[in-house]
């Protein structure tokens, strides 16, 4: 299995307030059970990104807090896996998607995770407590050197 040298900190483009981006040095996240740490190689800018920067999604509570790392269309490489991960290994090339459903509701079980029934259920964080992640919107995104994905 390939091993990668992972630094303690990384550079990330953070949204610190509406219309204010700042390049920051932040800790590299550690993958938990069922998660992978990816080295981000490229990130696209989606039409939703400028709108979020300029405050166009206040009604949806995007971003949920500051500083926030945006970015949900990316490609990279797995550099470390968390406990229980069997489908990926360090060195695998990957591309990301914005949504990870809860895996428990009827829609997720049918493979329709982008319409997860637990998304946004609590009205504040997109359903994180129910297992749903929306990277770059409610959960830290890929405008950084590394990120953890489920």
For each of these PLM feature ranges, what is it?
Residues 19-23, 47-48:
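Short N-terminal binding/cap micro-motifs at the start of the first secondary-structure element
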Residues 17, 39-41, 150:
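A secondary-structure boundary/capping signal
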Residues 1-11:
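Basic/polar N-terminal segments that are highly enriched at the extreme N-terminus
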Residues 102-150:
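NAD(P)H dinucleotide-binding glycine-rich loop of Rossmann-like/cofactor-binding domains
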Residues 48-54:
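Cytochrome P450 core scaffold surrounding the K-helix E-X-X-R motif
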Residues 25-27, 148:
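Generic structural detector for well-ordered beta-strands
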Residues 27-43, 57-109, 114:
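Glycine-rich beta-strand-centered segment in the early N-terminal region that forms part
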């Amino acid at each position: 299995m390939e091993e990668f040298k992972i630094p303690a900190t990384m550079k990330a483009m953070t949204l610190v307030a509406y219309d204010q981006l700042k390049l920051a040095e932040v800790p590299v996240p550690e993958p938990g059970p069922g998660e992978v740490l990816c080295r981000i190689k490229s990130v696209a800018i989606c039409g939703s990104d400028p709108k979020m920067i300029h405050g166009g999604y206040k009604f949806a509570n995007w971003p949920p807090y500051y500083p926030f790392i945006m970015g949900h269309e990316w490609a990279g490489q797995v550099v470390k896996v968390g406990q229980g991960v069997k489908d990926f290994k360090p060195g695998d090339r990957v591309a990301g998607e914005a949504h990870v459903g809860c895996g428990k509701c009827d829609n997720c079980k049918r493979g329709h995770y982008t319409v997860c029934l637990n998304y946004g259920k609590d009205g504040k964080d997109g359903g994180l407590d129910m297992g749903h992640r929306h990277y770059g919107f409610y959960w830290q995104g890929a405008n950084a050197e590394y990120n953890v994905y489920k």
